Each structure stands twice: as C-alpha cells, then as structure tokens.
Amino acid sequence: MSKFSFEDIGAVVATFACGEDVTGGKVVKVTENGTVGLCSAKDKFCGVAMEPRKGGAAVQVKGFVTVSTTGSLTLGWANVEADGSGGVQSSADGGIPVLVVSASENSAVLCL
C-alpha cells in the first residue's frame, strides 16, 4: 500500500457520446466526431472512460489515472497501447508516451 495518492491530480475530463459497450475504467478511442468506443489491442487510446450514463461518458484525457494492465510496465516514462481488454500494455512500436508512477501485477497509475 502506498503512502501517497496521485488520484485526480491534474485531471482533465471531457464529455463524449458513447456506445453501450463503453464501461467505466476502460481505455477508449475516438470512433467518430465527438464519440468514443472501446479500443482493440494495440490501439492508441484517447483516455479512460468514467461511468457512462444515457449514451454519454466523461473521459479523463489528462492527469493521473489508475488503469488495468496486461504484462508489466516499467516505472518512469513508457510507451503504452490498449491491450484489447480495456487496459493497457507496453508498446514496442510506438503507443502513447505516459509517466508510470506506480505499477503492480494487474494495474498501474499513469500520468496521461
């Protein structure tokens, strides 16, 4: 357990339309004008969906956020991409540059 919390530091949240498949805590991508959807494996994501309601979702696009992970992430600056299950994984060929400040077996705290 960490003595420090990064929760909500620098959070920038925007509201998008979304499909019924979008759920809170999953990384999403822009699928059409003003609309987000779930990412496939290796997609570059735009942010992390909050709990969607009535066809819309708040999406955190900047700041510190906790995400689920596949595989391990290196602390410090890393390139990540969607893992196809709503989380992220290390990207060997591009991805999104993020600052990883905490990592465990199945989750990490990133600064987008």
Whereabouts are the PLM-identified features?
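Surface-exposed, low-hydrophobicity beta-strand/loop segments enriched in small/polar/acidic residues
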Residues: 1-112
